[in-house]
Amino acid sequence: MYEEPYRWVEAVGNRRQYLDEQFKQGSPVVALTYDGGILLTTVSKGTPKLYEIYDRLALGGMGHPTDLEKLRFSLLEMAHVEGFNRSPSDVTGSRLVKYGIAPVIKQAFEEVYKAPFIVRILVAELGQKPEKDALLTINYDGTFEETTGCAVLAATPVAQTKMTAYLKEQTPATLSLEQGLDLSLRAWAIGSLAHQQEESDQRAEAEPTKTGAGSSTAAIPSADVLMEHVRGIAGGRTIECAILERQAPGTSKYRALKPADLSRLLPKALQSVVVS
């Protein structure tokens, strides 16, 4: 009887290791506020990772497509029930995360005899004014964080930290959609390269004959190098972008950027990888 709490703690630790492993091949997600609203960007393998949730709410995700789809439908249902029973203005990202989806993810994670959700989620909320914009991220254990300006999902905490630091350092006072897309893709490349570097460092540490292993403090690559990395990866994938547009007509502010939009907005080095 006295061993049960320790077994539970050990089981939770094992679940963390298992879940961390599942995200190693995941594609980062970047959310960034720009002059006209909020931009979400990722590079997907075919299954969409960006969705509309409600009039002023968007979702980005990493993880197992089935789990992501299940939670997306849960968010959709919660948002529309809330909007019907109360009012559309009461449907906020904060309420949906804090009182809706985060407790569900937390419960699944802590029930060690059931499968957890293999997901990391980003919820973007477009405010009536720019200062009211909100970005929320939820980890696979149900913990969440609310930020402004930018937010990311990444394979590892190290990659996430590097992406966030890069965005905060590179974001100017004013940012057009075209500039925001360029910056988001560079931040995506930072996350992708950071994870590759972590794996390289781990392999080097496992080979004691090699010296000079570990380069986690390496300088940030130039913009050209970052874009070349995106170009190399995106050739077999899809650059996926969506915006919450403050001045869009109607109640729904969500719009997925089509290939024609991307061909106009992407840097010249990447325009050839957009497939209509």
Model-flagged regions — what are they?
Residues 1-276:
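Long, low-complexity N-terminal extensions
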